[in-house]
């Protein structure tokens, strides 16, 4: 006598891990966690993210888009993908709007000095701005008063309450 039976698919959750990097850094190797793999099944995940080495400070969604198994078992799973967040810390300069954005991973009060250099490397101008940085919030500083020329370069220095200068640009 035959007895009918049904084998249900296992539920599998693949979650992109939240990650941090600094502005102007190479794209990190995204990581994931999985919950629900059965037996010796293993997998690898493919991600998409808008972040590139030239991206601005801020947050970007890390999206797991697909997965591959070491054996042909993908059809045995109901797969749910969970996005993660890439936080890009540091500072960036927007030439068009003449603003500097600073994205910090901790709360702190700082004095921000934006120093501009002419194309030949001579000092062109300095602007000081006091900032109360909040963790994971973007602060924007208007530096249009520096009259930065197209080929000038800038460096941004932060001085915290301990008077420790930190250069946060290349």
Sequence positions of predicted segments:
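Structural beta-strand segments of beta-rich domains
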Residues: 28, 96-100
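Beta-strand signatures of extracellular beta-sandwich domains
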Residues: 111-117, 155-157
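Solvent-exposed serine/threonine-rich low-complexity stretches and specific carbohydrate-binding patches
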Residues: 124-135
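Short acidic/polar inter-strand loop motif in beta-rich domains
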Residues: 160-168
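Exposed aromatic-hydrophobic patches
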Residues: 99-101, 137-146
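Solvent-exposed beta-strand/loop surfaces, strongest in extracytoplasmic domains of secreted
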Residues: 1-91, 106-107, 118, 131
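Short, surface-exposed ligand- or partner-binding patches at beta-edge/loop junctions that are enriched
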Residues: 148-160
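Surface-exposed, short loops/turns at beta-strand junctions within beta-sandwich domains
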Residues: 53-56, 145-150
């Amino acid at each position: 006598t035959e007895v009918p039976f049904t084998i249900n698919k296992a539920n599998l959750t693949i979650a992109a891990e939240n990650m941090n990097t600094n502005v102007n850094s190479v794209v990190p190797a995204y990581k994931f966690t999985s919950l629900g793999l059965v037996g010796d099944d293993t997998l690898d995940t493919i991600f998409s993210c808008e972040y590139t080495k030239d991206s601005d400070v801020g947050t970007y969604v890390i999206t797991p888009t697909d997965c591959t198994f070491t054996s042909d078992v993908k059809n045995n799973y109901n797969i749910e993908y969970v996005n993660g967040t890439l936080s890009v810390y540091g500072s960036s300069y927007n030439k068009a709007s003449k603003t500097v954005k600073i994205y910090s991973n901790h709360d702190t009060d700082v004095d921000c000095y934006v120093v501009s250099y002419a194309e030949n490397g001579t000092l062109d101008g300095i602007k000081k701005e006091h900032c109360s940085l909040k963790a994971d919030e973007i602060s924007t500083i208007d530096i249009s008063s520096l009259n930065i020329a197209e080929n000038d370069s800038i460096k941004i220095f932060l001085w915290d309450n301990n008077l420790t200068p930190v250069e946060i640009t290349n």
